[in-house]
């Protein structure tokens, strides 16, 4: 199959490149090549692997502007945000180099503390962490560079090779990242990038016998399907799945600050972040005041060309996404929601207006599903208990936020929230690249974060020595 797939910019629909539409046979060949890469990279001394990762970090800093412009054009991410993503990716490669020795150092166990088996006083037991082999990394469209870093850098650090399958919407960034790794000294076979449609090659990167672990970031439905196939074959998995993160605003909070943070948490990158503040839950006593502040701040956001330095919000990724968002709006209208358009973008491109749903309720798609776009449903509640109930009402549990000046109250509520993180007086968008990141319920399986990813990507082997 020698066809190619055109890559179009979501901001103007122009063709910006093309990638190979790989066949299953071609993907099998790439996986086999990656296994050869594993045999090379796993035998490299750790200092050589970390030297490569540090070099990648340096190149990313040097190439920040070029990569940021590619990211803005390909993913529709505003250029200022794109620069931050490239810089974060650089830091992830550096942190992976720094953390690797700590993760891989193993342990010495005092087995003489146990009566059974007999004669433990004559034994030494140690453990080592060993690479799994070939890791399949399936990337989302929304963070093609930083997600590449989070999945590839820890894998290489601990001695795995990687097959990267980028989103078909944003494959060019992965191809550039692969080039940078090779420039930094990584064997070409240690990272392979496969491109094509998921319904044609997706099963191959999951079920191939040489693949030992699949790490996926994307929708819950797709992720659970992948997990089911992988686990049935005895493969390891890391799943970073959907989210419908609530922002709870209590009556004693700083309303203006809460509104500013909520606007950015919901509308940044056109609402296409897994940990965007997708549901806003406000105490009835302050709802009108909060909504007025939210409305005015959202109206100040500029929706437009991602390459424009003054742009705050770009387009959604494709027409399918825009259609789904329209369905959410129509559903909200039919179920009693008051719809307000707060800011619009250009006519050309996949620009979706920044939208507010006032008087939202739990029957709406906007509250029941993960809405990947700039739609902000606001729910009024009369008590903290009701706020907790609304927050926990979905199948998702990625991150959450509480705004209040009462720390004791915030901590009590945080105990009841079923989420991987509870952020007090700040955005659901907060993420520390070295700390555990993942969710409860259907928001994920396992955790990302440099050290946690390394642990997930290695096997723990015990070695017992009996002294004779």
Model-predicted regions and their roles:
Residues 12-18, 211, 248, 302, ...:
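Conserved C-terminal structural/oligomerization subdomain of aldehyde/semialdehyde dehydrogenase
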Residues 11-79, 86, 100, 285, ...:
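N-terminal alpha-helical segment of soluble enzymes
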Residues 213, 221-361, 424:
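ALDH superfamily catalytic-core signature
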Residues 53-148, 186, 191:
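N-terminal Rossmann NAD(P)-binding subdomain characteristic of aldehyde/semialdehyde dehydrogenases
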Residues 15-22, 37-43, 136-137, 247-250, ...:
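Short, well-ordered beta-strand elements within core beta-sheets of diverse protein domains
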